[in-house]
Amino acid sequence: MLNDYYQNIGMKGFIQRYGIVNAVKRGAFMFIKLHLVKDYEVRKVLWQERASTKIKPYLKYKDTDVEGLSFPENDVENPIWIYWNKGIEQAPIIIQKCYESVCKHSNQKIILLNDQNLADYIRLPEYIEKKKDAGQIPMAGYADLMRFALLEHYGGTWIDSTVYLTDPIPDMILNSDFFAVRNSLLLIDNPVLYPAWFLHAKKGNKTIREIRNVAFAYWLKNEHVIEYLLPNLIITLVVKSNPEVEKAIPYMNSDYSEYLVKVLADDYSEEKWNWIKKLTGIHKLTYKLSPDIEAEGTFYKALIENSIE
């Protein structure tokens, strides 16, 4: 199982991510054995639902534009946005392969952001920069704010650096006013239904503006995340507050996009690879892997060595 290859963030990282209060609450809810709900995944959804109720009051800020946010003048419009803070040359090899796949399968202009060129496109409010420098806003949270603001101002497609493409992005997505992948849990009312790892929006889109405003309002008033999937909570709340917007989003199930990452440690099979590519051309991977996954003959090794197309 791929879960065996994930690198754990440890207790120090857990507290740094959530803050002491949120870490204690989340840890107690998720891991105390006396909990009535024994299934971990169900318990996680219940925690996310609880977190969602804490975020919902911030919807009142969805029409309040962000102060201190600015953009240098340039002629950028509707590009693909990718961010790796230290530059792609310093990224793990799997990140580099993901970037190469986007270049191969995209006709849009691709803007590869890093900490050196970020100010050429966006300048975040001073309170955000201070909280980031103090370690209160994690890099993932910082990137969330960045993606929402960039998409609202310039439009385009945000693709996480861990996304691997095997086909061009469908026109149905590129022609939509707003798009997000859907995390389907069948009959469960999923509080993190819409993830942030692949988003598309037209310049000035109202939905992405509301998402941006709610996200910045949260960080104006908080110093830690209440839930790691905070952006998913915000996107889901905003989208569900407008049924017509949700109805217009082209349907794409994340189950298919998250299948390749589950078999990276498996023995490579051309038949299975062709099947995976038929399911979807957009694959969400991860760089948080143990070196043990680099065994010969695996899907991971084939991907890294460019031996699969």
Residue ranges and their predicted role:
Residues 1-143, 161-309:
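Glycosyltransferase-associated regions of secretory-pathway enzymes
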